[in-house]
Structure formats: C-alpha cells, structure tokens
Design a protein with these regions (language model features):
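Non-catalytic C-terminal interaction segments of nucleic acid-processing enzymes
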Residues: 1-46, 57-162
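Conserved catalytic cores of phosphodiester-cleaving nucleases, focusing on short active-site segments
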Residues: 48-54
Length: 162
C-alpha cells in the first residue's frame, strides 16, 4: 500500500517546510486539502489523524482559551471513528535553571507559561480528562523530527491506533 498523506489546507506552508522535505525525501506522496479535523491523515488509513501543535503554549491554549473549539474537534474525530493524535513540536522546557524532558502529559505538571497565567497542572487535568473521554493521544517530539514522527504515527503497527 502506498503512502499518501492529506495535509489540512489551513497548515501554513512556511511552518511545515521541513515536514514536506521529510515526506519528499522518503517518497511519501501528499496533497493539500481541507480536513474536517486534525492536520495530517493517510488517505488509505483515515482512522488515525495527527493534529500538530507548534509548542506546549499552543497546546495549553487549546486546553483553556480554545477549549470548546478543540472539544468539538475531538467529538468530530470520535464520531468519525478516528483516533486523534496530538503531536506537540516541543519535548522539553526550561524550569528555572534546568531543562525538563516531556514524554507524556504528566511531564507538564511543572510547566508554566511566561506569557500567561496558565499552569501545567491545569493543562494536565484537561488532557487527562479528554484522553479518558475521547479517542485522543498526546505525544511530544523535537521540532526537527516532526515529519518523521507524523509518518511513524500514520504508518505504525500500533494496535492502540485504528
């Protein structure tokens, strides 16, 4: 089965240049079209959709200010029988004088935004609730590995994904 990814038309070309480079270098075909939810989906395997987040701050915004909009997106995924994998392009953050590695939502507990009053504990509670209620998975990666991770998620043999 060939690899053919649909990229949501609302993804900004400048933001995804390195992702497209990865797809091109690895023979992954793609086209840009509007998706009902998420940002990346394999044409042949629509049960998994990746929703890319630029950083933890964007994820936090989805959990707070944009809570209702993002909840509706998860409901669309659930109704379609799809798993929504949120891929955050940040896998560490600075906490005072040290770097904290982020491998799971639990690692967000100590996070805080220098620009807003949002605390990691709040983000964690919202995500824990959502992952229990919706077909949602949250992953973190280094920004340089986003294209590779999207392909791995969409083409993995992970039984936890449809």
């Amino acid at each position: 089965m060939s690899k053919y990814i649909i990229i949501d038309s609302r993804e900004k070309p400048k933001a995804i240049g390195k992702i497209l480079d990865h797809f091109d270098k690895n023979g992954i075909e793609y086209e840009v079209s509007k998706l009902l939810f998420g940002d990346y989906m394999d044409w042949n395997r629509p049960g998994i959709v990746v929703d890319r987040k630029q950083n933890i701050a964007e994820l936090a915004k989805n959990c707070t200010v944009e809570h209702e909009r993002f909840r509706r997106e998860m409901e669309k995924a659930q109704k379609a029988g799809a798993t929504l994998v949120v891929l955050v392009e940040q896998n560490r953050y600075k906490d005072r004088d040290s770097w904290i590695e982020v491998n799971s939502i639990e690692d967000l507990l100590r996070w805080s935004s220098p620009h807003t009053m949002v605390r990691g504990e709040k983000v964690y509670r919202v995500l824990a609730s959502w992952t229990a209620k919706y077909p949602l998975r949250v992953e973190f990666c280094d920004k340089r590995q986003t294209g590779r991770r999207i392909a791995e998620i969409l083409y993995s043999g992970d039984p936890g994904l449809k």
